[in-house]
Amino acid sequence: MIERGKYQSLTMVNWNGFFARTFDIDGLVTTLSGGNGAGKSTTMAAFITALIPDQTLLHFRNTTEAGSSQSSRDKGLYGKLQPGACYAALDVVNSRNQRLLFAVKLQQVAGRDKKVDIKPFVIQGLPSHVKPTDILVESVSATQARVRQINEVKDAIAEFEGVQFKAFSSIVDYHAQMFEFGVIPKKLRNSSDRSKFYRLIEASLYGGISSAITRSLRDYLLPQNGGVKKAFQDMESALRENRMTLEAIKTTQADRDLFKHLITESTNYVAADYMRHANDRRNKLEQTLSLRSELFGSRETLIEQNNLLNRVQEELELLIESESALEQDYQAASDHLQLVQNALRQQEKIERYQEDLEELSERLEEQMMVVEEAQERVMMVEEQATVAEEEVDSLKTQLADYQQALDVQQTRALQYQQAVQALEKAKQLLGDDCLTAESAQALVSELKNKESESTNALLSVKHKLDMSSAAAEQFETALKLVQSIVGQVERKDAAEQAKIVITKARESQQIAQNEQQWRAQHRDLERSLNQQRQARELVKEYQKQFHVELTDEITFEQERERHAMQIETLEMTQEELREQRSEQRRLEQDAAAEINKLEAIAPTWIAANDALEKLREQSGVDLEDRHAVMSHMQVVLEQEKELSLAKDKLAERRSQLESEIERLASPGGSNDPRLKGLADTLGGVLLSEIYDDITIDDAPYFSAMYGPARHAIVVSDLSGIEEKLVELDDCPEDLYIIEGDIDAFDDSSFDAEELEGAVCVRMNDRQMRYSRFPEIPLFGRAAREQRLELLRNEREEVVEKHAKAAFDSQKMQRLYQAFNQFVANHIQVAFEADPEQALANVREKRGQIARVLADLEAKEQQHRSQLQTSKQALSSLDKLAPNMALIEDDTLQARFDELEEKIAQLSEAKAFLNNHAKAVAELEKIASALDADPEQFDALEAEYKAADEQLQELKKQIFALSDLVERRHYFAYSDSVDLLNQSSELSEQLKAKLVQAEQMRTRSREELKQAQGQMNQYNQVLASLKSSHQAKLETVQEFKQELQEFGVNADEGAEERAIRRRDELHERLHTSRSRKSEYERTITSTELEMKGLAKRLKKVQKEYAELRTFVVAAKAGWCSVLRLARENDVERRLHKRELAYMSADELRSMSDKSLGALRLAVANNDDLRDALRLSEDNARPERKVLFYIAVYQHLRERIRQDIIRTDDPVEAIEEMEVELARLTEELTQRENRLAISSESVASIIKKTIQREQNRIRMLNQGLSNISFGQVKGVRLNVKIRESHEVLLHGLSSQQEQHKDLFESPRFTFSEAMAKLFQRVNPHIDMGQRSPQVLGEELLDYRNYLELSVEVNRGSDGWLQAESGALSTGEAIGTGQSILLMVVQSWEEESRRLRSKDIIPCRLLFLDEAARLDAKSISTLFELCDRLDMQLLIAAPENISPEKGTTYKLVRKVFKDHEHVHVVGLRGFGQTDKPKSEVQEMIEEFES
């Protein structure tokens, strides 16, 4: 790659403040930073002086204009120099890597004009290690140096081998050398070019928008085009050919556009509707099938639901009947339970009252005994009180009557003796010596008990004795009792029957005693029988439900184990089914996601596949994979390159042939068209014109004889020719001039000798020339015409081959573009698997998954039902488990029957006892009378006597003891005996005894009172007890009467049986009601489901009927549509698979949009308009196909068979593209040819204008994003003047109207142009300009254009670039952008003039960059980097850019010496160059 040339350094020698300073120029931006007067402008002035050493232009205003007087003629350069020789040198390395030192020597010229003498020179080939200062400055000593003169500089570089020094006498030569080596962008031929270049540099230096440049942008940006002046020949023929070609292009373009538009819009219109109907039909079919499936399924479900409903209703009716009976039984059982409970409560009350009655009887007896004891105690206390009273009275009497007392004491002594005698008697009778008066009382009670027993025994014996004595009477009584029990009986059998009755009574009593045990057993057996019956019912129900007969516990256990295992298995299976269902659902979701994904990529793949198929058809190669596509694309590219190369070679050959034909057709057949003008200038003729009439045979000889001089100019006199030659500006490098007679030229001046096939010409004694005969002689008109004939024939062949090669190249290029477009858009998906096939597979897989899910759900439902059945079975078995053992027990009924018999016996026994218990009891008492033996009477009498004697003895003992008890208080009179012996103490003793007796009396009275009170209390309690007893007794009798009225045998098991019966019936009733509720819920839910299902069925049936009608009706229409499409071979155009994935709304929108476009497209075609109007009927889709067929037919008729070899409009578009490309290329080639031959002024002007517009547009692209402050972009606005545009239109398109101007011999072409301009623009005043001058201006295309600069500033948008509308920084940035456009334009303009391996340097200036903000400076840096430009800016010392190279300049004054101290900061530019010894010495000297 060719690199752009770069300025490497600027060297200043002997300038103010700079004795010998070299500034390295950065590859991008070099910044000179310093305060005012630091030397920034001086440095830039030195650079500009070395670049444009023209003192007439140099004017450094910033140092001269401010405050300068009119008399001062200093242009700013004189004052910047020191006396003596000064240098400014630019070190440049160009694109060829050549080092060049362009320098100028400056020296002040004495005088008031302050002129400066400037001498430019260049040093080429200087070694890289040698610095410019090493050449321009000479070291005198270690501390001194001097500036060399230019001759000394030349001598100094002579020391280096290969270094060239060249001084220039003119600035033109200096700039020509600069242009040749790529230092400046434009070739500066004259002062005008230099002035433009300087104005550009000046505008760059001082910034802002230069009015001098903006006012004449056309001169700066638009290059001259002198070839327009050569457009006079063959104008009409060239215009006619171009017009024909343009007409063919327009026709082909119109046909192509029409074909494209109609094909695209009609295809979109019809295909969208076609695919919408196809999609709709497919969806309707799917909906119909779905509805039919749902309809049949709903019917089956409805039938099943109806069967279930009928079955449940039947069961419900049976259940209601049984429930009514159960309710009656339950009510009866509840009533019976109520009676039993009432009877039991009554019996409990009777028992409770009887208990209370017995308790009251006991308490009454106890109270009676207590009362008796109380009475006895009262009697004893009364007796004691009476005795005490009597004792007191006696003592008082005794005290009153001592004798009486003495008698009393004697009486008491006698009583005491009698009591002792009674004690002795009792001891004797009882034989107990330990008997005392105190113990006698207790013994009396004991003996009385014995007396009672003895009395009873005596009475019994006496009774028996009396019975025996009264046997006859008792026998009759006993016989009556027996007969009352057993009925009539013989007297002799009475005793036996009495025994039987008594035995039966005893047995009945024994049976009655077993009542509780038997009834408990009866309850247990009855419960067991009920459980057995329920168990057998459960077994029957289980057998009916599960078809398994439970015969024993083993079968029961096996069945329960089977169901338990089945439940476990089913639960595991259900878990597996749930997992499988989850997995299947996940697979279904994955399949749905995959379907969505495939449906999303299917249109892209279909488009890619269609593109691939089209590419295969175009290429004729089976493109199997990406590698094959890329490989064949490379092959196509190589083929296209080969065809393009062949086409280019043929085009080049055609151009060569045309150039050669043109040259040979020109007068003299000269290679250089300038020779004719030079001949006219020099007043001679061409040698070839003199020999124009030679024969073909002589042509080789004369061509070889004259050799290079065959195109010489023959003049009659050579005198004065040299002066004319010096004045020539443009002439061939070698120009031969021969003196001779033009009218009678003689070749004798040539010393020629003809050899074999050659000529030897002796020039002089020391030179000779040997020239062979040319194989193809071109000297002379005959030879040229012969050559022209051959060249024209060859040109025809080349043109034909070129056309064929162009067609093939265009076709191959389009194929490569197709490959390129396919690779860019479709290669990523084209070779992927077919998504439609994958869709079918995934949909089939999803269908399988759906079926598997349905099977799994059915299995799960079946398993759930089985699980529920097994759980119900286990529940039934669990209910049956406690009673399973009873099923096998066949003895229950026998035992129950046996107990029933016992219960019956019990009832009979209880009835017997209830009826005859009292009679039997009486009978038992006198039963013996029936079998009494009269012989037993004596024994009974003897026994009676013995018992009587024993009783009499006991009574004696009791009497003796009673006497002793009665006399026991006489033992207290033991002192009376002593008193009888002590009569003197009797009185005192009596008094003491009286006191004791009174005390005893008082106690006795108290005790009597207490005893009487207590007895009264006891009597009251006894009375209350008697009344309570009587009331309880009456209540018990009433309760017994009520109990008999209940009519219920309220035994212990009656309530339990009643409760069990009621609970059993309640449970059965509850179960029945639960089942009834379940049946009713089932019926209700089933009816609701059936109603909903019937409603849904009607709706589905209606929808199905409507859809089926629609589908059947649409089928016929669709078949007609398909038939039309297939018969007319448009189905493949209409059936676009990618549209199958669009919604109906999208397709309808697509069709409607195309319909609107088609209405406009066919508005001028009656047939298509009518067909389109008919096709808008949505009810007739076949009409859209008919419209599409009509469009195809219409396009087939429009196909030009002369250029298109197909009947298919789609394929015709491709061939039209090829034809259009061929015609366009032909026109382009002709325009190029016309431009080269200057045959069409208007075409060249238009083309030139278009080229410059495109070039300016490219310039705008580089600057559109530039930002300075509020300015966000800079652009050049170029437009054609309306008046000149009308002129161009008249030149190119209205030639027939203006034949009077261009075919008139009265006007030159320039005058005709001026006249035409006046004709087409009558409103424009031409002023004083002549038609010739105006015509020459009209031949310059730059006068046709208007240029202006616009900026995009803030909210104002694009506006005219004027300094007043912009800030200073914005104006500077905008100005730099404009200048950069100019530089780029100059480079493009001069590219053809310079060597191809040279890219010129690009550098601009900017002084006082302080007016730019940091962002704008950054934009400049970015601009330099992007456009490979160098920038030299001056900025105040407070600005230090982060990038590039920055030099800090500080001007210092030491005594009378002034210098600038420089510090360089390297950025990202080039590396520092090593300093030379001289430079180091100079820097040391300056410091």
UniProtKB/Swiss-Prot annotation:
Compartments in which it is found: Cytoplasm, Nucleoid
Keyword list, A-Z: ATP-binding, Cell cycle, Cell division, Chromosome partition, Coiled coil, Cytoplasm, DNA condensation, DNA-binding, Nucleotide-binding
Subunit structure: Homodimerization via its hinge domain. Binds to DNA via its C-terminal region. Interacts, and probably forms a ternary complex, with MukE and MukF via its C-terminal region. The complex formation is stimulated by calcium or magnesium. Interacts with tubulin-related protein FtsZ.
Annotated spans, Flexible hinge: 667-784
GO cellular component: cytoplasm; nucleoid
Origin species: Vibrio parahaemolyticus serotype O3:K6 (strain RIMD 2210633)
Signal peptide extent: none
Domain-related comment: The hinge domain, which separates the large intramolecular coiled coil regions, allows the homodimerization, forming a V-shaped homodimer.
GO biological process: cell division; chromosome condensation; chromosome segregation; DNA replication
Biological function: Plays a central role in chromosome condensation, segregation and cell cycle progression. Functions as a homodimer, which is essential for chromosome partition. Involved in negative DNA supercoiling in vivo, and by this means organize and compact chromosomes. May achieve or facilitate chromosome segregation by condensation DNA from both sides of a centrally located replisome during cell division.
One Pfam family of this chain: MukB_hinge
Ranges in a coiled coil: 297-458, 506-601, 637-666, 781-806, 836-1109, 1210-1266
Molecular functions (GO terms): ATP binding; DNA binding
Origin: domain of life: Bacteria
Chief subcellular location: cytoplasm
Entry-linked InterPro entries: MukB, MukB/SMC, MukB_hinge, MukB_hinge_sf, MukB_N_dom, P-loop_NTPase
Protein name as it appears in the record: Chromosome partition protein MukB
Binding-site positions, ATP: 34-41
NCBIfam families: PRK04863.1
